[in-house]
């Protein structure tokens, strides 16, 4: 199965099972440690993740709130950069050839590696999609084409402030799915206005004909359920990382990784169970 096929297949499985929305957890590669990342990814899949977003640590993460920033800092302090992240994905692929993995990060590490070299390395590692926070779609046609040529989906962000023209532009180049940022500001901030999200998704779907995931501001089962009634996927990161961070801080040094992984799996499973109860509000009767 090729990389872009894995994303389509994941959403198809969700639909065939009659579920309202896919569950996409976000974690920072290398947090709580590089050694824990692959076991953590497998644990998230066991908990019910349909896809996994893997953050590439970067020293100036402008879109990330304090929780995700701390996770990136912990990973960087342990020597995790883009090349190590690709190695971790390849390690994950040895035991899981089904679950899509999407890298989320910033342009600087990719530019240092070179866009074409990165696209080829991502494909070789088994990456399914790439979301670069600070690459505007109007300026990345060539990079998006390189990714697509390598079988890797170029994934883009949309925000509450996105104009219809920008939505239309993203609809032309995005593959896999589109990530709608439900709040203004950084990850982990603010509170959700579900009605506003529903209105924006209706506009997005006029121009975007692939799944639309929603993230930012989803912190518990109730907020995940509200979003799942409208979106094709629920993306959840800050609260998951915070749960691991708090649990790891309470554990002894030799138990920190295991405690964080167990807490993440247990917490995410509660979200998955909640999502399984949701019926899509705009689904046909």
From Swiss-Prot:
Classification via InterPro entries: Aldolase_TIM, RibuloseP-bd_barrel, Trp_synthase_alpha_AS, Trp_synthase_suA
EC number, as in UniProt: 4.2.1.20
Record-linked SUPFAM superfamilies: Ribulose-phoshate binding barrel
Superkingdom of the organism of origin: Bacteria
Keywords: Amino-acid biosynthesis, Aromatic amino acid biosynthesis, Lyase, Tryptophan biosynthesis
Keyword Membrane: no
Pfam families: Trp_syntA
GO cellular component, as recorded: cytosol
Pathway: Amino-acid biosynthesis; L-tryptophan biosynthesis; L-tryptophan from chorismate: step 5/5
Active-site residues (renumbered): 53 (proton acceptor), 64 (proton acceptor)
A GO molecular function held by the record: tryptophan synthase activity
Catalytic reactions on record: (1S,2R)-1-C-(indol-3-yl)glycerol 3-phosphate + L-serine = D-glyceraldehyde 3-phosphate + L-tryptophan + H2O
Subunit structure, as described in the record: Tetramer of two alpha and two beta chains.
Reported function: The alpha subunit is responsible for the aldol cleavage of indoleglycerol phosphate to indole and glyceraldehyde 3-phosphate.
Family: Belongs to the TrpA family.
Protein name: Tryptophan synthase alpha chain
Species of the source: Bordetella parapertussis (strain 12822 / ATCC BAA-587 / NCTC 13253)
């Amino acid at each position: 199965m090729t990389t872009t096929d894995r994303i389509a297949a994941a959403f198809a499985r969700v639909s065939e099972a009659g579920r309202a929305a896919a569950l996409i957890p976000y974690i920072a590669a290398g947090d709580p440690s590089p050694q824990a990342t692959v076991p953590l990814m497998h644990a998230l899949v066991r908990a019910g993740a349909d896809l996994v977003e893997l953050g590439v640590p970067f020293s100036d993460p402008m879109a990330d709130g304090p929780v995700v920033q701390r996770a990136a800092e912990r990973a960087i302090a342990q020597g995790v950069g883009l090349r190590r992240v690709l190695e971790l994905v390849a390690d994950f692929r040895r035991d899981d050839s089904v679950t899509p993995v999407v890298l989320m990060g910033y342009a600087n590490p990719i530019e240092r590696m070179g866009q074409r070299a990165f696209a080829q390395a991502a494909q070789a590692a088994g990456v399914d999609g790439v979301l670069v926070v600070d690459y505007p779609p109007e300026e990345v046609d060539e990079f998006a084409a390189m990714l697509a040529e390598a079988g890797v989906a170029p994934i883009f962000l949309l925000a509450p402030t996105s104009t219809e023209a920008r939505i239309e532009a993203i609809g032309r180049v995005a593959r896999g799915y589109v990530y709608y940022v439900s709040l203004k500001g950084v990850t982990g901030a603010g509170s959700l206005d579900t009605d506003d999200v529903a209105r924006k998704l209706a506009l997005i779907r006029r121009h975007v004909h692939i799944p639309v995931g929603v993230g930012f501001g989803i912190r518990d089962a109730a907020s995940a359920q509200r979003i799942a009634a409208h979106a094709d996927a629920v993306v959840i990161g800050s609260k998951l990382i915070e749960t691991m961070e708090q649990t790891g801080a309470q554990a002894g040094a030799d138990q920190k990784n295991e405690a964080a992984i167990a807490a993440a799996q247990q917490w995410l499973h509660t979200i998955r169970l909640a999502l399984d109860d949701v019926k899509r509000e705009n689904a046909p009767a």
